[in-house]
Swiss-Prot record:
Any one GO molecular function term: GTP binding
Protein name in UniProt: Elongation factor Tu
Organism of derivation: Lawsonia intracellularis (strain PHE/MN1-00)
Species lineage: Bacteria, Pseudomonadati, Thermodesulfobacteriota, Desulfovibrionia, Desulfovibrionales
Presence of the UniProt keyword Transmembrane helix in the record: no
Enzyme class (EC, first level): hydrolase
C-alpha cells in the first residue's frame, strides 16, 4: 500500500509520557509509534533512539527530550518523552514542551510510586489539563483483583491532586508486548489502539492561540511625529484589529486606548494575529505613558499583580546557575515576557533553603505589578545570568 502524503488537515495535539522511573514510559512511546505506523503509516521510532535523546537548551537549562510524532484517524500528535526524572521537572516548569494532555504510565507490578505522585502534582501545578492512564506490565500480574486495586489507587491519587479520578480513562496492557507485536490487529497491540482512542476522545482539541483574547508584550516604544505613539512586539495570542479598544497593563495604572493602525514590515494591515511581529499605533497615548515590559491586551482580559506563588526549578552549578543555596528574603530579578522586575522570595514554612538543582515552591512579591495570570512562565536572573525558571501557579494579590 502506498504511503499517504502527510497533510496538515487534522487537528494537532501535544502530549507526553510521565511517570515513575522504569515503569515503561520510553517503551510505551516506542510502542505507540510502532502500532500507529502499522495502522496509519508514519515512522516507527525504536526504544534506543528515544532513550538517547539529545540535550536541548531552553532558557539556559539543559533538558534531554525525545520528540516523536504519530497519527490517529482523527489527529496528528507530537509526543515528548524524557529520559531522566530531572528532565521531566525542568520540562514541565519551563514549558519547553507544552502539553495539551499527558499519558501517565504506572507499572501494575508496583502501583503508584513517589515520582508518579510528583509528576501528577507538577502536571496539576503547571496546568496540564488532561491526564490519561496507561497501566503497564499487566501481563506480569496474575491476580485480577490486584489489577483492580492498583487502578483504584491510581484513580484516588488523581482525585487527591484535583483531576477527575473517576472519569480519567485507564488502559491496561503491556508496552513491551505491543512493541514486539507484528500486527496492529494483534491482541498485544490492542491496548495501544485503545490508548490512542482514549487520547482522541478524552483530550479535547486545544484552543488555538489565535482564538484566545489578544495579548502582546511591549518590546519597544516609538513616537512618530504627526501620527502618535507606536508600540512594537510579537503577538502572543489573539487578534488585534484597527479601531479596537485595548488596554495597556502592568507597571503603571492600566490605561484604555484604541488601536488606530497596525503595521508589519512597514506595510499597513487591517489586523495582526498570534505570531506576528507588529507595530501598533495607539490613540492619544504619550510616549512616556507606555514602556517596555507592559502588555497590550484585549479589554478586561488580564490584570496586574505583585504577589504570586510559583513552582521553580533552580539551575545547578553545571548549568551555569548558582554555586550556593539561597534562603527566604532572596531578591533576584524575575524576567517575565520582556522585562526584569525585582522580587522578594519567601520559602514555604519548614523549608530552610533551596539548593542549586532543586525544584521548590516560591512565594514572591514583586516591587511593582505586572500583567500576570496562572501559567505565566518566567526566568529568575541575577546580574544578567539565569539562575532559575518558574511558572506562576497561583495569584495571591
Amino acid at each position: 500500500m502506498a504511503k499517504e502524503k502527510f497533510t496538515r488537515n487534522k487537528p494537532h495535539v501535544n502530549v507526553g509520557t510521565i511517570g515513575h522511573i522504569d515503569h515503561g514510559k520510553t517503551t510505551l512511546t516506542a510502542a505507540i509509534t510502532k502500532v500507529a505506523s502499522m495502522k496509519m503509516g508514519g515512522k516507527f521510532v525504536g526504544y534506543d533512539e528515544i532513550d538517547k535523546a539529545p540535550e536541548e537548551k531552553e532558557r539556559g537549562i539543559t533538558i534531554a527530550t525525545a520528540h516523536v510524532e504519530y497519527e490517529t484517524p482523527k489527529r496528528h500528535y507530537a509526543h515528548v518523552d524524557c529520559p531522566g526524572h530531572a528532565d521531566y521537572i525542568k520540562n514541565m516548569i519551563t514549558g519547553a514542551a507544552q502539553m495539551d494532555g499527558a499519558i501517565i504510565v504506572v507499572a501494575a507490578t508496583d502501583g503508584p510510586m513517589p515520582q508518579t505522585r510528583e509528576h501528577i502534582l507538577l502536571a496539576r501545578q503547571v496546568g496540564v489539563p488532561y491526564l490519561v492512564v496507561f497501566m503497564n506490565k499487566c501481563d506480569m500480574v496474575d491476580d485480577p483483583e490486584l489489577l483492580e486495586l492498583v487502578e483504584l489507587e491510581i484513580r484516588e491519587l488523581l482525585s487527591t491532586y484535583g483531576y477527575p479520578g473517576d472519569d480519567v480513562p485507564v488502559i491496561r496492557g503491556s508496552a513491551l508486548k505491543a512493541l514486539n507485536s507484528d500486527s496492529a490487529d494483534s491482541d498485544d497491540a490492542k491496548p495501544i489502539l485503545e490508548l490512542l482512542d482514549a487520547c482522541d476522545s478524552y483530550i479535547p482539541d486545544p484552543q488555538r492561540d489565535i482564538d484566545k483574547p489578544f495579548l502582546m508584550p511591549i518590546e519597544d516604544v516609538f513616537s512618530i511625529s504627526g501620527r502618535g505613539t507606536v508600540v512594537t512586539g510579537r503577538v502572543e495570542r489573539g487578534v488585534i484589529k484597527v479601531g479596537e479598544e485595548i488596554e495597556i497593563v502592568g507597571i503603571k495604572p492600566t490605561i484604555k486606548t484604541t488601536c488606530t493602525g497596525v503595521e508589519m514590515f512597514r506595510k499597513l494591515l487591517d489586523q495582526g494575529e498570534a505570531g506576528d511581529n507588529i507595530g501598533v499605533l495607539l490613540r492619544s497615548v504619550k510616549r512616556d505613558e507606555v514602556e517596555r515590559g507592559q502588555v497590550l491586551s484585549a479589554l478586561k482580559s488580564i490584570t496586574p499583580h505583585r504577589k504570586f506563588k510559583a513552582e521553580v526549578y533552580v539551575l545547578s552549578k553545571e548549568e551555569g546557575g548558582r554555586h550556593t543555596p539561597f534562603f527566604s528574603g532572596y531578591r533576584p530579578q524575575f524576567y517575565c515576557r520582556t522585562t526584569d522586575v525585582t522580587g522578594v522570595i519567601t520559602l514555604n514554612e519548614g523549608v530552610e533553603m533551596v539548593m542549586p538543582g532543586d525544584n521548590a515552591t516560591f512565594n514572591v512579591e514583586l516591587i511593582y505589578p505586572i500583567a500576570m495570570e496562572q501559567g505565566l512562565r518566567f526566568a529568575i536572573r541575577e546580574g544578567g545570568r539565569t539562575v532559575g525558571a518558574g511558572v506562576v501557579t497561583e495569584i495571591v494579590e
